[in-house]
A protein has these predicted regions:
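Ribonuclease/tRNase effector modules and their secretory precursors
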Residues: 1-90
């Protein structure tokens, strides 16, 4: 699985939410829950483990000459509602 994100945005997200987009890639290495977040552009939310805590990441599925990759948009420590959703769906 390939990932892409803006480095400056990753630094901003880490300062604001305590988790970088680089760290958020870990979510996809384990069991995670996905739902659709918005339709235009089509974005998804994944909830899973990252740096020893539940986190959420918003991503877009994109394509290039090498195939499919995930463009990470933002991430944060999972809310109580997201923790419950994860627990109910794994």
């Amino acid at each position: 699985m390939r990932f892409d994100f803006e480095r400056e945005k990753s630094r901003d997200v880490k300062q604001k939410h305590g988790v970088s987009l680089r760290d958020a890639r870990e979510i996809f290495d384990q069991v995670y829950v996905v739902d659709q977040k918005s339709g235009n552009p089509e974005q998804f939310r994944a909830i899973g483990w990252c740096r020893g805590r539940l986190c959420s990441v918003i991503f877009e599925v994109r394509h290039d000459s090498e195939g499919e990759y995930y463009h990470l948009v933002t991430a944060w420590k999972a809310t109580t509602q997201e923790e419950q959703s994860y627990a109910q769906n794994v």
